């Protein structure tokens, strides 16, 4: 009887151990406690399913202005642990068949893990999953001292359905949000901005120095003063008013004035003088008692009233509408050599007025 009892107790222990191991494997495969996954969704859904009547409150308008409390700004550089509370021990862990999970790390232990990560330079290097810089995106430190993007680790846990480190394959790691990558990225950006600003300041200072201080080399000095002279000439040219439209308007105005003057002159000198007017002009010329041509300074009529047949044309006189008398040949020569007069508008050699002429014979 004792042998049968001992044999049955061993079978019971084996059965309990087998059930405990199976239960532990099921719990391990279900991954109920992923560190980065949002474990509070179920609680939020439960709160949303509550009746809305509990949230409805009567609002009384008293006319008084309520003081709005500004929300407290949380420290963006604050580090915190993402892991929820550790799950209860499974039956296999309680029986000692499998070792219990490691306890949550303390602050000192997390500091050691962080120092080990800094020595490895994980925050300086890109994320091992997406191969991109950490920049200002959320960064997660694992208990194995490896660093990843929070979104990358969350996607890795979702698609692998396991809680193992992507690098060292450590199971059931703990996670903590850190900001070393963001801090290093800000330092890098500040360094770039400062370097760019210093470069701009130095280049501006050097350009001003080159504009004001001439070089010592002869060729460079010559180019320096040539450039200065070119700049001065350009400024002088730019200072002039080159309004072409105004110049064209002034030219058109001058042409209009000239046309009006010529039109008045044509109206004055263009009409034909009648015989009666010529007689009056001839009487006025006789009153002048002019005896010599003002062009050749020779007498207007031959001495003693003699006439030479060959030189008859040379003795012809021209009476002008201004009552001046000249030799016809002298007047023709003057008209041929006059510059600037436009026929038939010639100017009298004495009074400079436009004239019409009539040929008189001595």
Swiss-Prot record:
Keywords associated with the record: Cytoplasm, Metal-binding, Repeat, Zinc, Zinc-finger
Gene Ontology CC: one annotated term: nuclear body
GO molecular function (one): zinc ion binding
PROSITE patterns attached to this UniProt entry: IQ, ZF_RING_2
ZnF (RING-type) ranges: 127-169, 293-352
CDD domains in alphabetical order: IQCD, RING-H2_RNF32_rpt1, RING-H2_RNF32_rpt2
Listed SMART domains: RING
Tissue specificity of this protein: Highly expressed in testis, less abundant in ovary.
Residue ranges of every copy of the IQ domain listed in the record: 186-215
Top-rank lineage group of the source organism: Eukaryota
Major subcellular location class: cytoplasm
Subcellular location: Cytoplasm
InterPro entries assigned to the protein according to its UniProt record, in alphabetical order: IQ_motif_EF-hand-BS, RNF32, Znf-RING_euk, Znf_RING, Znf_RING/FYVE/PHD
PANTHER family (alphabetical): RING FINGER PROTEIN 32 (PTHR14991:SF0)
Stated role: May play a role in sperm formation.
Protein name (record): RING finger protein 32
Origin species: Homo sapiens (Human)
Primary gene name: RNF32
């Amino acid at each position: 009887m004792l042998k049968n009892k001992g044999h049955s107790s061993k079978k019971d222990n084996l059965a309990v151990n087998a059930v405990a191991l199976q239960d532990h494997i099921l719990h391990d495969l279900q991954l109920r406690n992923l560190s980065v996954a949002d474990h509070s969704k179920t609680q939020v859904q439960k709160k949303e399913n509550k009746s809305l009547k509990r949230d409805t409150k009567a609002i009384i308008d008293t006319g008084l202005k309520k003081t709005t409390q500004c929300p407290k700004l949380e420290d963006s550089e604050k580090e915190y642990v993402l892991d929820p509370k550790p799950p209860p021990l499974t039956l296999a862990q309680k029986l000692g068949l499998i070792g219990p999970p490691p306890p949550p790390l303390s602050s000192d232990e997390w500091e050691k893990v962080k120092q080990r990560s800094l020595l490895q330079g994980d925050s300086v290097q890109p994320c091992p999953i997406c191969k991109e810089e950490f920049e200002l995106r959320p960064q997660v430190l694992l208990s194995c001292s490896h660093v990843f993007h929070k979104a990358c680790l969350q996607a890795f846990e979702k698609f692998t359905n396991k809680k193992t480190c992507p690098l060292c394959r450590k199971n059931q790691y703990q996670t903590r949000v850190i900001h070393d990558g963001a801090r290093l990225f800000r330092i890098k950006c500040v360094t770039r901005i400062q370097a760019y600003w210093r470069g701009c300041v130095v280049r501006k200072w050097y350009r001003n120095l080159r504009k004001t201080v001439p070089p010592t080399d002869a060729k460079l000095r010559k180019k320096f003063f040539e450039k200065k002279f070119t700049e001065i000439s350009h400024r002088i040219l730019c200072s002039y008013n080159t309004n072409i439209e105004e110049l064209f308007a002034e030219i058109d105005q001058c042409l209009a004035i000239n046309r009006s003057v010529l039109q008045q002159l044509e109206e004055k000198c263009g009409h034909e003088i009648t015989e009666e007017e010529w007689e009056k002009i001839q009487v006025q010329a006789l009153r002048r008692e002019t005896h010599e041509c003002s062009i050749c300074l020779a007498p207007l009529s031959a001495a003693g009233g003699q006439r030479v047949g060959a030189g008859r044309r040379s003795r012809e006189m021209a009476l002008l509408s201004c009552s001046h008398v000249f030799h016809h040949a002298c007047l023709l020569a003057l008209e041929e050599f006059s510059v600037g007069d436009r026929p038939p508008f010639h100017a009298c050699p004495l009074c400079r007025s436009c004239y019409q002429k009539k040929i008189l014979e001595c």
